[in-house]
Amino acid sequence: MSLIISLIESAQGHYPLVLLMVFLLTFTKSCALVSLAIPGTSGLLLLGTFASASLGHFLLMWSSASLGAIGGFWLSWWLGVRYRHRLTQLRWLTAERLARSRLFFQRRGLWAVFFSRFLSPLRATLPLVSGASGLPLRSFQLANVTSGLLWPFLLLSPGALSLSLW
C-alpha cells in the first residue's frame, strides 16, 4: 500500500499530465476508431486514486474524464453520419457486431445510446450506428452527455474513496 501511496504523491506534482491522461483515456475508450483496443475501465478505476487528495482534484478529474467521454462518443456519432454508407467496409467492424448494435439501437432507441456507454462491446459501435441511423444530434447529445457524466463518476469514485477512507 505504501508503494501505491508514494506513486500517487509523486503524480500529484504532475496533476495537469494526469488530467490529460484521463481525458485521452476516456476519449479513446469512447471513440469508435480505437475503443476496442484500449483497456479504459481498469485504467479509470486506478486513476481514480489520484483524485483522492481533495474534492477539487476529484472534480477536475471527473470533468476531464467526462469531456473525453462525451467528445469520443460525439466523434463516433459524427463518423456514423458522415460514413453511414461505408460502415460495412470497415475491417474492424464485423457484420455480426454491426448487426447486434443495430438491433439493440432499434429495440431501445435513445436508451441504447445511454446504456452502450456501460457495455464495452456496444461502446465501440453504437454511437456510430446511431449516427448512421439518422438519430438527430440533439437527441444523441441528451444520452451522450448524461451517460458521459455518469460513467466516469462511477469509475473514478471507488479509487477516490478507497484512499480517502484508508
Briefly describe each language-model feature range.
Residues 1-22, 52-141, 157-166:
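Membrane-interfacial helix-loop-helix
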Residues 23, 27, 46, 128-129, ...:
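Alpha-helical transmembrane segments of multipass membrane proteins
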Residues 23-42:
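Transmembrane alpha-helix interface/packing and boundary motifs in multi-pass membrane proteins
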Residues 25, 68, 146-151:
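Transmembrane alpha-helical core residues of multi-pass small-molecule transporters
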Residues 27-32, 150-151, 157:
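Hydrophobic membrane-targeting signal helices
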Residues 32-33, 44, 120, 126, ...:
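Hydrophobic side chains within alpha-helical segments
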Residues 40, 144-146:
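Central hydrophobic cores of alpha-helical transmembrane segments
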Residues 42-49:
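Hydrophobic alpha-helical segments within and immediately flanking transmembrane helices
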